[in-house]
Amino acid sequence: MEKPLFRNQKGLMTLLASQTISSLGDWLHILAVLTLAAFQLHASPLDMSLLMMSFALPVIVLGPVSGLLADRFDRKTIMFLSEIGRALTVISCVYVSELWQLYVLLSVQSCFSSLFLPAKNGKLKELAPEAHIQQAVSVSSIIDNSSKIFGPALGGTLIAAFSIHSVFYINAGAFFLSAVILFFLPRDAFLQKANTPQEKTAALTSIKEGLQFLKRMPLLLTGLLTACVVLFVLQIGDSQAIILIRSFSGAPPELAGWCMAVSGAGMLLTAAITGRRRITSYLLYFSAGTLLLGLATGGAPFLSGMGIAGITLFIFAFFIMGAAFGLVHIPFQILVQTTVPVDYSGRVFGAIQSATTLASILGMAGGGVLAEWIGVSLAFLVCGCLLIMIGLITLIGKKIAESRRYLVTKSNKGAQG
């Protein structure tokens, strides 16, 4: 009989507990920073875009380096220092009086944040039993997506009940608590072997090795490209939803918030389902997720003239978008965890973090440009058609790969006979 995931897994439970608090802290901080910029520092739309860029750009640049550090040094120590750094940066936001100060602090915090994810993912692979790695990744995804739903809601409640500055103090406390929990994690088991003089290599060479590992695995590369395209379109949807909502008569002002919340709920549902089903074909998940996202994105503009029913279906479309993204993102994370050796995982996850963050930025920026150029409704439709085409290509690729495997197997059997 198969043992439950968390039986005798104190280290894994400690890591996930720290991740839960840290992820909530991330979403509390995002809401508090946006509120501070918009209502106290009177940021313009361009200022808000620069604010998001100052948070995202360091992740893109430092992703591969952070991954290398996660493979070279103790991941527990890296995560601990990352949380302490984020806590101190968050407290500093209380004393901000100019927007440029907020840009600097967000960039510094982003540098600390970029250290956390590759180290956490590498530690997850190290601590989770091989037989339960799929469940562990699903639980980790459930934590992240639950935080996306409950973090902003909690942050809004705290801001309404107290003040923005109070939320910064609470947020810093969350990061400090996460650091305290991380103190009880075991040190990395693979470090003693990985850091022997014979195996030490130059930093740039190590980063290249991580990127080359991705190139050598066609399925991993396909998953990464699909995840980036899907994330790109999802960010267009999130960033331009408020513009599309203007075409809905009688739409409540909080509709954009509902759309973002149900998108997180869709990803949460997918994470829960994926953790219970053994994945036999990753390409099937990639193609299904891309097709569903294409249908939901392309169909959203046609709902604007349907009154209350259209608004309800529009919210449901964002639920489908979130679930569809989960069908690509979560199996891809499982694929990486199950195929990448533990001493390469930091570098590979660092490269993935850079690529997906770049896709998010391009989605946020490109969505505005595309909507200005051809109109927001047509932008949704074009993106939907593009995704459907990519989903069909992936599905055809799956069929071709299966046919080749069948022919090879049949040929081998004939040769043996």
From Swiss-Prot:
It is a multi-pass membrane protein. The chain crosses the membrane at residues 21-41, 50-70, 88-108, 166-186, 217-237, 255-275, 283-303, 308-328, 351-371, 373-393. The keyword Cytoplasm does not apply. Keywords: Cell membrane, Membrane, Transmembrane, Transmembrane helix, Transport. It comes from the Bacteria. Gene3D superfamilies: MFS general substrate transporter like domains (1.20.1250.20). Belongs to the major facilitator superfamily. TCR/Tet family. This is Uncharacterized MFS-type transporter YfiS. It comes from Bacillus subtilis (strain 168). The lineage of its organism: Bacteria, Bacillati, Bacillota, Bacilli, Bacillales. The gene is yfiS.
